[in-house]
Structures are given as structure tokens and as C-alpha cells.
Amino acid sequence: MIKVENVDVWGFEHAIRGMRNPMNSWDKSDSKFDVQTYWDEENTLEAEHYDAIIGMSDLDLMRRLYKAGTEHRKYLRQISVSMDITAPLYWWKEFDTYKVGTTSNSCSTMHKIAEKEFELDDFSYEQLSGNSVSVLNDLIDWLNFERREYRRTKSKAYWWQMIQLLPSSYNQKRTITMNYENVANIIHQRKCHKLDEWVEFCQELEKLPYVSEIMYEG
């Protein structure tokens, strides 16, 4: 299970301006910025809630620089995105390999593990068979026993039982900030991954403003 919410994207204006610095081609820029809604000449809604409406001249240059490689597409690293992601610990373990250009703030398992009772929906279990779900439910019951004893006695020994018994299917929420270069790398490296969470996450990334238009030429 993976859930992506509270997505925010910014930085198109300065990224495109900087993209045109090497050739002093600012006069060729045809994008519109800070637009909530934009209507064409036939009164048809073209875009809504975008930080920018990228013109075809700018988009063409963005595509060519993207194809030219990381040393030429520095503008991608100037477009930022933040989002809240809820995903199992086994997925976060792999996400944590993306260190450069990413910042993460997580809900604390260490501090908040005993705050509420454990429930089945706190875990990713959609691929488990019936017998395996029963095993997980038994584990949840035991975790809740350790939780009650910890809250009753304040003994750290019970806290340790929860920490070391907690399975990697436990879902954790984090707020992530990264840039479009990170986005492109993740899509390229993970869109056909064995884990469903990676496939679904890449699909969410492809929905970000202009990601597909840049990477796949529309």
C-alpha cells in the first residue's frame, strides 16, 4: 500500500529563466507563470492550479536538454516538489537510497509507537493469503498486549518488544521534498520494479505537472 497526498510543485519560473541563461535566449521564452486558471482564445480551459503554463518553445528546449543528460538538464534540479507519502517500512528502506536532493520528515516510530492501538489497517497486507493475515492479526494482538503493559508499567522492556517485533509491513507517513531530477531518476529506475508500491508511486510521479511531457515528449 502506498498513498500520496498534499502534493506541491514550485520553481518553474526561475528554472526556465536559468535554463535560457547559457544562450541568452530569454526573449524566446513563451511560458506563463503563477496562473490559477488559463483560458485560450476559444474560451476553453487549458490549465488549472498550475504553477506555470509552459510554452512550446520552452518545452522543446526542456525536452532537448533532458535528452542531453544530467549535465545539461540542470533546470530539473531547480523545480521542487513536496508530498506526504504513507508507505510500509520495507518500501521506505529502498526509498532511503535516494539521499542526494531529497529531504524527509517522518512520523516517529520511536516516540509514538505506543500512542494508539495497533490495527490491521496500520499495515500493508494486500498480498497476504488468508493464513498469513491470521498470523499478522495474532502479531497485532501481541503488540497491543506489549503496548498495554508498557503504558501500565512504563517499563522500557515492553517498549523494546514493540520496536523489535514491529514488521516491515508497518505503514509510516513522511513528508518528502525533492526535485524533478530525483523524480526522473526514480521513474527511470523503479517504474518496472517488483514491488507494487514502486510502480504505483511512479504513476503518481508521472502525473506531476509536465513530467510526462518532458520525459515522454507528450
Role assignments for model-derived ranges:
Residues 1-218:
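Family-specific signature for flavin-dependent thymidylate synthase
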